[in-house]
Amino acid sequence: MTNREEIERRRTFAIISHPDAGKTTLTEKLLLYGGAINQAGSVKGKQSAKHAVSDWMDIEKQRGISVTSSVLQFNYAGKCVNILDTPGHQDFSEDTYRTLMAADSAVMVIDAAKGVEAQTIKLFKVCTLRHIPIFTFINKMDREARDPFELMENIEEILGIKTYPMNWPIGCGKEFKGVFDRNTRKVLAFSSDGRANGVKKVDETEAELGDPALDELLTPYLHQQLVDEIELLDGAAEEFDLDKVLRGELSPVFFGSALTNFGVEPFLENFLRLTPTPLARVDSLTGETVDPCRDEFSAFIFKIQANMNKAHRDRIAFMRICSGKFERGMEAFHVQEGKNIKLATGTQLMAQDRAIVDEAYAGDIIGLFDPGIFSIGDTLCTGKKKVEFAGIPTFSPEHFARIEQKDTMKRKQFVKGMEQIAQEGAIQILSLI
C-alpha cells in the first residue's frame, strides 16, 4: 500500500460531551465493534466490575470518570481509526481543549433526557474555532428521553448549528426498538436478547419501512408512528449537504444507546463514511497549508503524560503526525530547539498500553519517549523547507489554589514536581516574584 493510500484511510476524531452523557461508554463500544476488545466496559463508578479501557488511571477507576485524554486505535472496514477520548468534567477541560487541536473531526455525545448542557457548549465552541466537522450522537435512548424533534431544535437553538438526522429512533426507554436509516431507507430493529448488559455486539433485524412484519416486530402503534414521523422529516428537513458538514455548518445526528449497543454500529459505519481524511494544517511561517500526503514528515506535540508506566516512571510526548511518514529511528528537526534529534522509538497507544511501531502516517497519533526535551506545541519536521505549526493556546484556569510544601527540607523535590505537572499542561503556575 502506498503512503497516500495509508494516509487516506486514516480517520482521527475526538469524542466530547458534558459529564455523564456516555462519552467513554460510547468509546468502549466503538472499540468493541472495531475488534480492539472482546468485552466492553463502561463508566459506572466504584462498583463496576469491568472498567473502561480508556480510563486507565486509578482515580478514573475509583471515581468512574475520565480525568485525562486517552488515545485509542483500531481498524474497521479498511479504515484506521484514531479515537481521542477526552474528559468531560470542566476540572480537566484544559486537557480536552489541547486534544481537540489534534483531531480532524469531533463526535458530540448528548444525553437524550437532558439535551445540550454547559460543558458541551464550551467544547463545541472550541471545535467551531477550528472549523472541524461535528457529528452528534444522541445517547441513552433506552431511557426516558425528550422528544427527538425537541432535541434537534434544542441543538440548533443553543449551539447555532443546523442538524440533519441520519437515522431516527423507534420509541424510547423500554420501548426503544431500533432506528430507521434515512440513507438506506431501512428499519434496523434491535433484538432484546442481544443486550447482555451491552458487553457483546447486538443483533439487528433489517426490514423495509411499511413491511407488515414490522407490526409484529415493533408493534402496530410504533410502526405507524415511525411512518408518520419519517414522512414529516422528509417533507420538512433540508437536503443533506456533505460540504456543509465538512465546513462545520451542518451536524449529522444519530440516535442510539451506547450502554446497550443499540445504534452504535450503524453510527460507526456512517461516521467513517462521512468524516474526513487527515486535514491539511497551516504552516505559521508561510501561511501555506501542508499537504498530509507530501513526502516530508511533519508533526506537533499536543500532550505530555508522565508515569503512564509506574514501573519505569516514564514520560511520553503525544505526537500528531500532520504529513508524510514516521519511521522508527528517523531523524527530524526540532523547530523550537533548532536542532536535529533522533526519534528512536515510537509507540502505538491504547490508553495505558503500548506497542512499538516501526512506521506511522499522517493522521496517526503516537507516543515518543520524552527525556525532557519536548514541550506542548513543539513542531518536528524533515526536508529542506522547515515548517512550524501554530502553538497550542492556553486557556483560563477553572480553579485556583495556593500550594505549599509541608516539609521545607524537600523544597527542591516540591518545585521539580510542580514544574513537571505544569509541563504536562495539567496546571498553570502563577508565582509572586
Please provide the spans of the model-predicted regions.
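Structural and coupling elements of P-loop NTPases
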Residues: M1-I433
